Every structure is written in structure tokens, then in C-alpha cells.
Regions:
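A short, flexible beta-alpha/helix-coil linker loop
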Residues: 2-4, 255-260
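Surface-exposed loop/interface segments of Gram-negative outer-membrane beta-barrel transport/assembly proteins
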Residues: 6-10, 20-110, 130-234, 261-263, ...
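Alpha-helical scaffolds flanking conserved acidic
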Residues: 12-14, 292-293, 638-643
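Transmembrane beta-barrel architecture of outer membranes
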Residues: 12-18, 235, 269-273, 684
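Residues on the lipid-exposed face of transmembrane beta-strands in outer-membrane beta-barrel proteins
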Residues: 19-23, 115-119, 168-174, 188, ...
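Short glycine/threonine-rich loop-to-helix capping motif typified by GTGT followed
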Residues: 264-268
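Conserved C-terminal beta-signal and adjacent last beta-strands/turns
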Residues: 414, 490-518, 605-652, 675-693
């Protein structure tokens, strides 16, 4: 696979190969194996987000009336590879230098291998041993030329990441039928998981010779950093499935893990599950229109550990070989494993010859002792602390509707609708946590958890208003923001839905998938920067004749009245001014559009950069033709099909930037409800050919 992305000189290549097989060693012993290998390479993966080396950052600050060809050539004459042309601002790099010189090459090799042996001990017992190895080698580089905004003397970084995970299992299974229609399938086993991450980085902060990206070209001592994470989890588990005449089913499971990443006194944790289902149509006489009526209920627990080295003080290596520094995250020698408990009840009903099927589920989930690194006051000497954060609840509904409206000899229309609604709530926080627990912060928006709220609550400064909702304006004619941050909305939507329609006529199949969500909020730093610079459509008000808020400075009557100087365009911000007696009067103070929008859309003002995240997408359209056996009879093919497809074709939303289905990256975590320097979601179209021999 070769992918050329929407930006010049970016993209990647990928090659995947898989081999699998089974060997019957004897009548009782068989061996299965499977190996897959993936190679992925890119000469340049683009930098994204709100950073000076991303094209989105350049486009935010670039003047819209500037011809990009003015940035050619990239370098000042006589100072090639040393001084890039930055004709309009030193804060943004030359876009051609960003795309063709500030490179991020990468090459990755990944393998997943599995081998298992199955031994039939008797008619009722089987024994299996299995081992699976997942291994990755990732080689990355960063090239930054001289006169880079962040690295004026150039920069080169070489990073090698080795990662593997080895899982070894033993499993004894039992299966039998007894009494009258009772079947039992049971198993008991053990697993040992070992993983290692070894990340080695070397960097040259400053280059002797321009354009030569080698560690030997470092202008000073090479910055060295190595991170090694080792982890082991030992487990024992059991499962049992009991069925009575295919009418009544009972499933039970249990597992105990011992994790090396947890404190010694808490490193063992047990979790289990129980589920039952009953087919009422097999027990009772139902109307002939009902083909199946199934009720189910389940209770399940899932345990979870964390990353290594959070239980004691471990010194961190610095950029210089042989030196260490104090950790920035406060360790915890007494935290507990995370446990999630889930309850679910559901119903599956199929009617009219399976032409109308409904599946409904209600679930309730409670997670306690979530392990996270919570921000803390830097004056303590630490920026974060490892804690058990408290208890979080999720509850909701899921509904799936499948129906066939039309069916004839040559034509079939199948429709599937999915709808889900989830409500998140924080029930308690750690005793050591503040009343408002900061989860993440990007731009002016803070994701804050508090009891009674959600883990997606967005907080920030808002416009200060009167009790009847009018915006308060100060004496200079600019809107006033609140003194403290306040709750502005939740990132999570009210509900999500999808609708798939498939139209099949003879050998042709047309599939159309729509999906979307209703509700949720998203804060955009891109909108803030565009608004401050007058590059969004919303800032045309007050700048063009005929638009709201527009006041012409050429109106001599206003000038003679001393309200504003001659020339230019002005805005009188809608709102009221507070009087000394506590009353309010309408604002009459004109300000320039540049000053007004610079204050109104500032990054810290979360309310004015917050939007509804509802959307509807045409997720996929696919037209496929399947060749008949008769058409293939003179070929070596057993089956063949060809399809035209398009993915992410359209998005209907009121969100003014690109795609509301996004999040911002903060320290390796995706923060919902926040956008920072994103690029447009790509639309893809292609042809797919599938053949079998």
C-alpha cells in the first residue's frame, strides 16, 4: 500500500504478509501456526497540532492575501540551508522549509507470531499450549534545519524504539453432555505475559554543517536519553458454559492476575463474570410472527493495572549521559488495582421470518480506583501524582434495529439502525484530590472532574452577564470575562446513531453508511486564533457595510460629536455598562473591529470559542459487483468481486472549523472536546478487487 497524503512530500508505504497453517502430527496431536509481518516506511510524517513545525500552525497565522509562491526560493541567496525566507513573520516558518526540510522520517517493522499445540486426552478432555509474540522495531528521526523557529542552529534526533510482548498459555478444556439435554463446556488455564519497551534517543541540538543530519555533526555534546519499561503479569483463570436443550444458558468465568506494576501488597486481584440467557420462544408457544424472543442478563468485573515504576521513587535519566534527575511524578506505594463492575440486561426479538429484528440493552457500569497521574501544585516539587482517582459511573441504552423492507427474486433492501445513549457521572474522588480535579488543560479550556459532574466537563472563562443574560461591557467598550473559570459544557454527546442501507440487485450491491451524534461541546483554539486575526467569517460583522455592528468612521456626524475619529470601521459591542449604583446602561462606546475581535475571541475566553459538536456524516458509500461461478469457470479463480468505494464523503455540522469528531493530544492522551491546530479530515475514494483461488 502506498499513501500520498493531502500535504506535499508526506505519506507512507506499507507492506503486509501473512502465513498460517495447521499440521496434524498424529490422530491426537495437532499444531497450528500463524505469522504476520508488516513494514511501514515514510520519508516524512507531517507534524500536526499547534506547533511551529506544522502546516496548520502556518495557515493559522498566514495572511490570506499572500501568494505562497512568494516563499520560493526557500533560502536567502548566498545563505542556502542557513537562513530561510520568512518575509512576513519570524513566528512562522517558511512552509516549503517545513514540508521539504523539517522532515520526520520513520521506518517500522512489526511481527505477530503464534504457535499452539492441541492434544486430545480423551473424549471429554483436551489440552492446549500456546505462545504468541508481538514485536516491533520503530526507527524515527527528526530533521530541523538552521533558522528553525525553535532550533535556530538546527537539530537532529535519532530514536529507536524496541517493543515486545510475549504471552504463553496453558489450557485444559472439558466438554460433555449428560442428563437430559444438558451440555457443559469448561476450561481452566494460566497465562504469563511479559513485555518490554526500550526507547533510546540521541539528539544533536545544533549542527556544524548545515543540512547534514548525523550525530557526528553535532555542534556540542550529544543529548542522550533512554527509557526502559519492563512488565510481567501472571494469571490463572477458568470458564464454564452450561446449556439446557439450547433453551437456557449460563456462563461463569473468573480470573486472578498478579501484576508487577502494582504495589506488592495490592498486586493480586480477582475478577469474575456471570451471564444467563433464556429463549422464551423455545419454552412457550409464541405467535407465528415471533421467530425468537431472547432475554439476557449479565454481571461482570474487569481488573486493570497500570504502567511500570509508579510504586517507588525512580530517578530519570537526563539528556546527558551518566546523569540523572529527580522524577516529576510523585510515586504511590499503596494504590490499588482498577476494578470495573458492569451490569447489563437485554432483549433480542426477531419477527416476521427474521425480517424485523430488535436488540435492546440497558447497562450500568461502575469503575473504582481509576489509576491516573493527576496534576498537582509544582511548588511541591512534583507536577503530577499517581493516585486512585475515585469512582466513575456510566449508564445507558443501546438499540439495534435490523429490517428488510423489500425483498423479491432479484432485489433485496436491508436496513440497520443503531442508537446509543450514555450518561457519565463522577460519584467520588480520591481523598487526596481537590474538590475540582484537573484532568487536562489545553489553551484556555480545562477538563475538570468533580463529584456529580463527568470526566468530560469543560471549564473556562465566560462572558460576564447580568441576571437577565446581557453581556457586561467595560468602560473601554470591550466585553468583560468572568473572574474565575466556570463550567461551560460537556464534551460527550447526548446520543450517537448510525444507519446502514444495503440495496442488492442481482450481482450488484450498493451500501450506504450514515452516522452521527447529537450534542456535546468542543473548544477550538484554531477558531480563537482565526477570530483574533480576523480570518473567520464571524469577524466580517462590523467590518463590511451592511453587516451587523458596522459603523463607518466616515460618518462626520459621529466625528463632530466626538464619538470616534474620522476614517476606519468601528463596532459598538452589544451589551450593557455597569454603573456605580449597580444599575446598567446600554453600551455606546465604539471600538475598532480589530480590537473588539481580539478581545472577544482570545484563547482564554472559552465560551466564545465553544461550539456544538453535533454532526451527520456520510461515512461510506460502496458499489460492488460479484462475479458468478459461470463467469469464472474458465479462470483459476474460485471467487472474485470488484467495488468502487468512498469514505468520509461529507460532514454536515455547524462546527466552523473542520471536523467536530476530534480531540487534542496532550502528553500521549487524547483529550475529548478540545481542538488545537487540526487539519481537515481526509476523504478517500478507490477501487477494491478481491479474488480467491
Amino acid at each position: 500500500m502506498k499513501n500520498n497524503w493531502i500535504l506535499p512530500n508526506t505519506g507512507f508505504e506499507r507492506v503486509t504478509a501473512t502465513i498460517s497453517g495447521m499440521q496434524k502430527v498424529s490422530r491426537l496431536l495437532s499444531v497450528n501456526y500463524r505469522t504476520s509481518y508488516t513494514w511501514r516506511q515514510s520519508d516524512n510524517l507531517p507534524a500536526l497540532g499547534y506547533s511551529s513545525n506544522s502546516i496548520s500552525y502556518f495557515l493559522i497565522f498566514q495572511n490570506p492575501n499572500v501568494n505562497l509562491d512568494w516563499y520560493r526560493p526557500m533560502w536567502k541567496k548566498g545563505e542556502e540551508n542557513v537562513t530561510q525566507l520568512q518575509p512576513f513573520s519570524k513566528l512562522i516558518g517558511n512552509p516549503y522549509v517545513t514540508l521539504y526540510e523539517s522532515l520526520n522520517p520513520t521506518e517500522k517493522h512489526a511481527t505477530i507470531s503464534m504457535i499452539s499445540a492441541n492434544l486430545k486426552l480423551s473424549n471429554h478432555f483436551d489440552f492446549m499450549v500456546r505462545s504468541a509474540l508481538q514485536m516491533e522495531i520503530d526507527m524515527r528521526e527528526q530533521h530541523r534545519p538552521m533558522s528553525d523557529v525553535i532550533y535556530p542552529k538546527g537539530y537532529f534526533k535519532k530514536q529507536n524504539i524496541f517493543n515486545y510482548e510475549l504471552n504463553s498459555d496453558i489450557l485444559l478444556t472439558y466438554h460433555n453432555s449428560f442428563l437430559d439435554g444438558v451440555t457443559l463446556n469448561a476450561a481452566v488455564g494460566g497465562n504469563m505475559m511479559t513485555s518490554k519497551l526500550d526507547m533510546l534517543s540521541n539528539a544533536a541540538n545544533g549542527l556544524i554543517t548545515p543540512g547534514v543530519y548525523k550525530l557526528a555533526n553535532a555542534i556540542s555534546a550529544i543529548e542522550f536519553n533512554q527509557k526502559i519499561l519492563n512488565k510481567r503479569v501472571n494469571s490463572v483463570y477458568f470458564t464454564a458454559n452450561l446449556a439446557y436443550k439450547n433453551k437456557l444458558f449460563l456462563d461463569i468465568s473468573g480470573r486472578n492476575d498478579w501484576s508487577s506494576t502494582l504495589p506488592e501488597r495490592n498486586n493480586s486481584f480477582f475478577y469474575s463474570s456471570v451471564s444467563a440467557s433464556v429463549l422464551f420462544n423455545e419454552w412457550f408457544n409464541m405467535p407465528r410472527e415471533i421467530n425468537l424472543l431472547k432475554l439476557r442478563a449479565s454481571w461482570a468485573q474487569v481488573g486493570n493495572d497500570t504502567d511500570p515504576y509508579k510504586t517507588s521513587r525512580y530517578y530519570e535519566t537526563t539528556n546527558f549521559a551518566g546523569s540523572v534527575k529527580l522524577p516529576t511524578t510523585l510515586f504511590n506505594a499503596d494504590f490499588k488495582p482498577e476494578i470495573s463492575t458492569n451490569y447489563e440486561v437485554g432483549m433480542d426479538i426477531r419477527t416476521f421470518g427474521n425480517r424485523l429484528n430488535v436488540d435492546f440493552a440497558y447497562y450500568y457500569n461502575r469503575t473504582k480506583n481509576q489509576i491516573l497521574d493527576a496534576p498537582m501544585d509544582p511548588t511541591t516539587g512534583y507536577s503530577k501524582a499517581t493516585i486512585n482517582s475515585g469512582t466513575v459511573q456510566n449508564m445507558g441504552f443501546e438499540v439495534a434495529l435490523n429490517f428488510i423492507p423489500v425483498i423479491t427474486n432479484d432485489f433485496r433492501w436491508t436496513s440497520r439502525v443503531n442508537w446509543s445513549k450514555n450518561k457519565n457521572k463522577i460519584l467520588s474522588l480520591s481523598k487526596s484530590a481537590d474538590e475540582n480535579q484537573l484532568i487536562s488543560k489545553i489553551g484556555g479550556a480545562s477538563i475538570i472532574g468533580r463529584v456529580g459532574g463527568t470526566i468530560g466537563d469543560i471549564w473556562g472563562y465566560k462572558l460576564k452577564r447580568t441576571t437577565d443574560g446581557q453581556v457586561i461591557v467595560d468602560a473601554s467598550g470591550l466585553p468583560v470575562t468572568t473572574d474565575e473559570i466556570e463550567y461551560v459544557g460537556c464534551a460527550y454527546p447526548g446520543w450517537k446513531a448510525g444507519w446502514y442501507n444495503e440495496f442488492k440487485y442481482k450481482n450488484f450491491t450498493l451500501g450506504i453508511l450514515l452516522d452521527g451524534q447529537h450534542g456535546g461541546k468542543i473548544y477550538s483554539t484554531t477558531n480563537a486564533k482565526l477570530g483574533i486575526q480576523g480570518k473567520s467569517k464571524a469577524t466580517l460583522n462590523g467590518r463590511l457595510p451592511g453587516t451587523p455592528l458596522y459603523i463607518s468612521g466616515d460618518d462626520s456626524r459621529l466625528a463632530q460629536a466626538g464619538l470616534l475619529p474620522m476614517g476606519g470601521t468601528y463596532i459598538i459591542a452589544p451589551g450593557v455598562v455597569a454603573n456605580s449604583d449597580g444599575s446598567y446602561t446600554p453600551n455606546t462606546k465604539p471600538v475598532t473591529a480589530q480590537v473588539y475581535y481580539g478581545e472577544y475571541y482570545k484563547v482564554e475566553n472559552v465560551e466564545t470559542n465553544l461550539f456544538d459538536a453535533s454532526f451527520l456524516k456520510i461515512r461510506e458509500v460502496r458499489l460492488e459487483y460479484v462475479f458468478t461461478k459461470r463467469q469464472l469457470r474458465k479462470t483459476p479463480l474460485s471467487s472474485a468481486s470488484i467495488a468502487l468505494y468512498g469514505r468520509n464523503l461529507f460532514c454536515f455540522t455547524d462546527y466552523p472549523v473542520f471536523d467536530p469528531e476530534t480531540g487534542a493530544l496532550n502528553g500521549g492522551n487524547i483529550v475529548p472536546g478540545v481542538e488545537a491546530g487540526s487539519l481537515p479530515t481526509t476523504r478517500s475514494m478507490g477501487v477494491s478487487l478481491n479474488v480467491s483461488f
